[in-house]
C-alpha cells in the first residue's frame, strides 16, 4: 500500500516476523538487544489474532493497546475510523508500562512507542482449531487498513 500510494515515506519501514515468542520473546528480544541504532526506531506495531472473534455480540471488537505517553496514537485511530468509515469497535487501552508476553514488550522496554492490536483471549488462541475458517475477514481487512494508517502517521508525521 505504501508503494501504491506513490508517496515516499519520510522514514524507513521495516516489516519483521519473530520466532520464539512463547519461549521468552526470543526473536524480538534479540533484535532490540543487538540493533545498533535502536534509538532510531520511532514506533512498533504488533498484531495478535486480529482476525479472530471473542465476542459473539460484537464481531468488530478488538483491543487497541498503545503507549499512554503518546496519546496521538489513540487519536490517530479514532480519527481514521471516522474519516475512512472503518467498521471497527476498538477498546482503547492506553498503557503506562506496555510490557507482557507478546513481542511489543521487547520494544516497550527500550522506550519505543507501541501499538498492539489484539482480540483478547479467543477460543482458538494457540489451539489446533486456529484455522482460516475461524477468521473474520471483514474485521481483519479493516484492522489491516487501520494499521496501515497508523504506520503512515508514524513514518510521515514530521513531529513524531
Each language-model region and where it sits:
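Alpha-helical metal-binding/catalytic segments enriched in His/Glu/Asp
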Residues: 1-24, 147
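Secondary-structure transition/capping motifs at alpha-helix termini
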Residues: 1-10, 35-40, 157
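Generic, well-ordered alpha-helical scaffold segments in large soluble proteins
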Residues: 1-5, 34, 80, 110, ...
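His/Asp/Glu-rich mid-to-C-terminal helical/loop segments that flank catalytic regions of hydrolases
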Residues: 4, 122-160
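Surface-exposed patches in mature extracellular/periplasmic domains of secreted proteins
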Residues: 5-12, 86-97, 158-160
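Residue-level preference for alpha-helix termini and adjacent loops
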Residues: 8, 30, 40, 106, ...
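Metal-dependent peptidase/peptidase-like ectodomains
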Residues: 18-119
Amino acid at each position: 500500500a505504501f508503494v501504491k500510494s506513490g508517496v515516499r515515506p519520510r522514514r524507513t519501514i521495516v516489516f519483521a516476523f519473530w520466532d520464539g515468542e512463547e519461549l521468552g520473546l526470543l526473536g524480538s528480544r534479540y533484535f532490540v538487544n543487538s540493533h545498533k541504532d535502536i534509538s532510531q526506531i520511532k514506533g512498533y506495531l504488533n498484531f495478535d489474532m486480529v482476525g479472530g472473534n471473542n465476542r459473539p455480540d460484537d464481531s468488530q471488537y478488538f483491543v487497541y493497546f498503545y503507549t499512554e505517553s503518546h496519546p496521538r496514537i489513540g487519536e490517530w485511530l479514532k480519527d481514521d475510523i471516522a474519516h475512512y468509515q472503518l467498521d471497527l469497535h476498538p477498546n482503547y487501552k492506553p498503557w503506562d508500562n506496555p510490557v507482557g508476553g507478546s513481542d511489543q514488550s521487547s520494544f516497550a522496554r527500550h522506550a519505543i512507542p507501541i501499538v498492539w492490536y489484539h482480540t483478547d483471549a479467543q477460543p482458538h488462541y494457540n489451539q489446533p482449531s486456529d484455522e482460516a475458517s475461524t477468521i473474520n475477514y471483514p474485521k481483519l481487512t479493516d484492522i489491516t487498513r487501520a494499521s496501515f494508517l497508523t504506520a503512515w502517521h508514524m513514518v510521515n508525521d514530521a513531529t513524531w
